Amino acid sequence: MGPQHLRLVQLFCLLGAISTLPRAGALLCYEATASRFRAVAFHNWKWLLMRNMVCKLQEGCEETLVFIETGTARGVVGFKGCSSSSSYPAQISYLVSPPGVSIASYSRVCRSYLCNNLTNLEPFVKLKASTPKSITSASCSCPTCVGEHMKDCLPNFVTTNSCPLAASTCYSSTLKFQAGFLNTTFLLMGCAREHNQLLADFHHIGSIKVTEVLNILEKSQIVGAASSRQDPAWGVVLGLLFAFRD
């Protein structure tokens, strides 16, 4: 009776161990997020892939990366993980084209072992190389920044850049990107064609949910470079940012 009882316990343990194994056909994908707004350069940014995850049956591996430029400032926000979407090849394009504030995205869903393995900004290097350069106009300048409002976009860190002829309106918004463990809220300011929502037609970029709220810009922020950094109107922008936070 003793040996039979022991074998029964061993059987239950074995069944329990089997139940925790990934089912046949389940993919292993990289799991990662990216959110960086300082010192982002095309050839020195690396997406570290430290973790992976087992997906549900029929799910694929997704990687979506968003590259933002405004003046000389750059930001990168990204997501890697499992996705229920159908597979699609790498798609790289401008969601908001230059001149002025530009937002580009790279996204794909694949279905092979750890296939969501992009680690650099090479797709955006090629995209930018094919984009004609714009002509700037000294008659209009705007406060410029991209980053977290209490870190990268405090008034002392905001620069003022001359605007291109085709993008001579000052733009400011608070953006929130959410997907899996990604939950990033940041400020985006710069020159644009008009002060409307730039991502109004993009509620999702891949699996990343996008929320955009326009900020109020006072005339003093638009006209003067030095005065715009320290003007009380900054309180309006920061007030909206705090209201936007969860």
Curated annotation (Swiss-Prot):
Keywords: Cell membrane, Glycoprotein, GPI-anchor, Lipoprotein, Membrane, Repeat, Signal. CDD domains: TFP_LU_ECD_LYPD4_rpt1, TFP_LU_ECD_LYPD4_rpt2. It is found in: Cell membrane. It comes from the Eukaryota. Residues 226-246 form a propeptide. InterPro entries: Fert-Immune_med_protein, LY6_UPA_recep-like, Snake_toxin-like_sf. Residues 142-223 form the UPAR/Ly6 domain. It is a lipid-anchor; GPI-anchor. A lipid is attached at residue 225 (GPI-anchor amidated alanine). Glycans are attached at residue 117. Residues 1-26 form the signal peptide. GO terms for cellular component: extracellular region; plasma membrane; plasma membrane raft; side of membrane. This is Ly6/PLAUR domain-containing protein 4. It comes from Homo sapiens. The lineage of its organism: Eukaryota, Metazoa, Chordata, Craniata, Vertebrata.
